[in-house]
């Protein structure tokens, strides 16, 4: 009996020891904390959070959050174009480490796992999004990000009603860079020096200049994009780039003390058009011509040009586009089409042209239409073709208003294999580019 009593006593001591250790590791079981909830619900329009890493490993993601006293949080972010907030649950718990805010269920902030790439994505995938409350700084709430384990701070700033209405514009300004980074370049120029153009990478909203050590986290703004910290370019400190009104795809630009930084889109490397192929106009070629059926699937034909200029509908394309030069000044932009039972006919507008800045400029057109077969083009059953031809003529002229770059390509296109092939790209709207035969003199 004595041995049994001693054994039971030993077991009892063992269990007590294990429980004591658990108490040290987690001295306070998680309980709802009304004090933190009170802080979170105090801002009438909620809070805004710029989620960005302190080491430029991922850039700025904008979130708006409005908490209620029933444990619900409504969110909006620049991760999507929607203007409709989404609602999920949250908790404010008192733990051994302090007051913890936990986001429950799926909401805007959980989309970070899909938006981020690499190690940053792994750190945000399949996790409970938790922030440790560390106190107030003025009107702001300060937290430690428990996801990352690097003591990174996140700041909740009081939001305004205007913040909620402008969030879709933030998405609109950042998404072109995210989706087409491979075609964006950063040009840094001064009033006197030769511009320097950098290919870029834009991953996790971090702008990196290729072949350099320069990188900076980026966040969307209502005007364009901003840098998380001052970014030195051309010896000057830049804090933001504004989106140039009307630029498609967007151009982002700023000038500081005579140094201009410009993020611009190009379907080909910027030096692609550095040659003098534009000088072939009126020296070795008298114009350009393409037939849609032979060029629409060419690798150099951009979707924007085909859809907006050449395509009539799902089954019909305009047959031909020509740009013909008459001497050193005059130009004729022509659309040719083959009409059933009526044959081939041309509709054209005339204008002036000029060669400068390595571009072909089209100018001074009255946009008056001329044709030798007005009855054919005016036939009611050809209405869709006429309307598209008019749009095409106007579009080509407008694309040339700020100049068309010209590059002679090392390819042949049947059935005119003997004709040189050129690539023309709009300077103002670089999404509009098209291959075309040169018509030899």
Predicted regions and their residues:
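Sec-dependent signal peptide recognition
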Residues: 2-7
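C-terminal motif of bacterial Sec signal peptides marking the signal peptidase cleavage site
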Residues: 12-15
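Acidic/polar, low-complexity intrinsically disordered N-terminal segments immediately downstream
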Residues: 18-108, 134-138, 142-150, 159-184, ...
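N-terminal glycine/threonine-rich, aromatic-flanked beta-hairpin/loop signature
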Residues: 56-98, 190-226, 299-372
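Surface-exposed, polar helix/loop patches in the mature regions of secreted/periplasmic/lumenal proteins
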Residues: 93-137, 256-260, 266-277
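Acidic, serine/threonine- and glycine-rich low-complexity intrinsically disordered segments
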Residues: 160-330
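Extended, amphipathic alpha-helical scaffolds
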Residues: 273-441
């Amino acid at each position: 009996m004595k041995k049994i009593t001693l054994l039971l006593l030993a077991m009892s001591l063992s269990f007590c020891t294990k429980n004591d250790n658990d108490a040290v590791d987690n001295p306070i079981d998680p309980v709802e904390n009304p004090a933190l909830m009170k802080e979170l619900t105090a801002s009438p329009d909620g809070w805004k959070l710029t989620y960005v890493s302190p080491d430029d490993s991922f850039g700025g993601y904008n979130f708006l959050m409005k908490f209620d006293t029933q444990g619900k949080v409504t969110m909006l972010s620049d991760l999507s174009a929607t203007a409709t907030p989404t609602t999920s649950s949250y908790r404010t718990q008192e733990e051994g480490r302090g007051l913890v805010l936990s986001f429950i269920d799926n909401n805007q902030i959980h989309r970070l796992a899909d938006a981020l790439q690499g190690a940053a994505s792994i750190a945000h995938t399949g996790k409970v999004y938790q922030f440790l409350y560390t106190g107030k700084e003025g009107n702001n709430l300060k937290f430690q990000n428990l996801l990352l384990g690097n003591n990174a701070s996140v700041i909740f700033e009081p939001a305004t009603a205007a913040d909620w209405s402008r969030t879709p514009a933030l998405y609109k300004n950042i998404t072109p860079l995210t989706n087409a980074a491979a075609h964006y370049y950063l040009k840094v120029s001064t009033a006197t020096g030769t511009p320097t153009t950098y290919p870029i990478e834009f991953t996790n909203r971090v702008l990196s200049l290729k072949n350099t050590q320069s990188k900076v986290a980026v966040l969307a703004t209502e005007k364009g994009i901003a840098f998380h910290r001052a970014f030195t370019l051309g010896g000057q400190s830049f804090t933001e780039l504004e989106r140039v009104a009307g630029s498609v795809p967007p151009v982002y630009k700023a000038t500081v003390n005579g140094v201009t930084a410009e993020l611009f889109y190009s379907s080909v490397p910027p030096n692609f058009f550095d040659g003098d192929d534009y000088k072939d106009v009126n020296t070795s070629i008298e114009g350009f011509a393409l037939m849609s059926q032979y060029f629409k699937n060419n690798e150099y034909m951009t979707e924007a040009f085909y859809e907006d200029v050449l395509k009539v509908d799902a089954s019909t394309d305009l047959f031909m586009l020509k740009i013909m030069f008459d001497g050193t000044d005059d130009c004729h932009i022509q659309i040719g089409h083959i009409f059933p039972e009526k044959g081939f006919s041309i509709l054209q507008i005339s204008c002036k042209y000029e060669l400068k800045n390595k571009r072909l400029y089209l100018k001074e057109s009255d946009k008056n239409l001329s044709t030798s077969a007005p009855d054919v083009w005016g036939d009611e059953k050809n209405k869709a073709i006429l309307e598209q031809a008019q749009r095409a003529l106007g579009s080509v002229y407008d694309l040339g208003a700020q100049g068309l770059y010209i590059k002679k390509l090392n390819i042949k296109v049947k059935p005119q294999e003997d004709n040189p092939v050129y690539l023309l790209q709009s300077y103002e709207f670089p999404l509009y580019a098209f291959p075309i035969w040169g018509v030899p003199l």
